[in-house]
């Protein structure tokens, strides 16, 4: 299974995403670095393991309160061998850097989802987002029509992000059984390697995680596989 570290950016610094309450996110405290800047955290991840994929959430762009675009593009330029999955809110199709894969989240995709997603020609990763009380966010049509989905789909449970409450295993099992031709990615709630083993049983292809790394619950030793 592929483990993908997550970096949440707000106002130019890395913050600790927790429970989906974005207004309350605080500067990150991590065993990987004593500074909450993106380069320190990213290099902390790379000291752990030679990750080839990282996820960056631009929280300012997602909440329409500015953006961290220049900083993110500088990071992509400085680490050309790493693929970055970027969630920058509702974006328009454009020419992205070669190591940039856009994440399109259901929370900001409305009833015109077919027209919007078609513009990307399946060159994106979809995030099916569950809200802070577990509700499905975004257009109902998007959740019901897998033909709109690309090959890779994130099952994002915002209420579990940063919570150390464990993964939404039943939801992931449902999606894997209902849509065996898709590759599902777990996001939210991973506590330790035991949760990773649970996800493997459900044939989850990858997992996004941050807190387990920053708390030292998953270490470099665990990643020697």
Pin down the residues of each PLM region.
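Glycine-rich phosphate-binding active-site loops on the catalytic face of alpha/beta enzymes
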Residues: 89-93, 98-115, 157-162, 188-223
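Hydrophobic faces of well-ordered beta-strands that scaffold small-molecule active sites
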Residues: 3-9, 54-56, 82-88, 100-104, ...
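Short catalytic helix/loop segments, enriched in acidic residues and glycine
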Residues: 21-43
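Conserved anion-binding
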Residues: 7-29, 96-162
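Active-site/ligand-binding-proximal alpha/beta "capping" segment
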Residues: 145-185
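Charged helix-capping and loop-helix junction motifs
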Residues: 67-73, 137-144, 165-174, 223-225
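N-terminal active-site wall of soluble small-molecule enzyme domains
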Residues: 45-98
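Short, small-residue-enriched loops and turns at beta-alpha junctions
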Residues: 60-66, 132-136, 159-165, 215
């Amino acid at each position: 299974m592929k483990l993908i570290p997550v970096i949440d950016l707000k106002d130019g610094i890395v913050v600790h995403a927790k429970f989906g309450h974005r207004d309350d996110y605080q500067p990150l405290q991590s065993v990987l670095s004593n500074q909450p800047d993106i380069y320190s955290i990213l290099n902390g991840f790379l000291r752990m393991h030679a990750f080839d994929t990282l996820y960056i959430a631009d929280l300012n762009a997602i909440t329409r309160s500015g953006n961290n675009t220049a900083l993110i593009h500088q990071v992509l330029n400085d680490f050309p061998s790493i693929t970055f999955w970027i969630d920058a809110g509702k974006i328009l199709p454009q020419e992205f850097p070669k190591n940039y894969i856009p994440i399109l989240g259901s929370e900001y995709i409305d009833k015109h989802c077919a027209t919007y997603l078609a513009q990307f020609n399946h060159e994106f990763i979809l995030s099916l987002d569950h809200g802070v009380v577990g509700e499905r966010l975004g257009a109902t049509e998007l959740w019901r029509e897998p033909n709109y989905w690309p090959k890779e789909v994130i099952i994002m449970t915002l209420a579990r992000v940063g919570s150390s409450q464990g993964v939404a295993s039943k939801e992931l099992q449902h999606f894997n059984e209902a849509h065996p031709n898709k590759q599902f990615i777990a996001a939210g709630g991973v506590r330790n390697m035991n949760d990773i083993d649970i996800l493997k049983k459900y044939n989850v292809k990858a997992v996004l995680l941050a807190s387990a790394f920053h708390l030292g619950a998953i270490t470099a030793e665990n990643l020697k596989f």
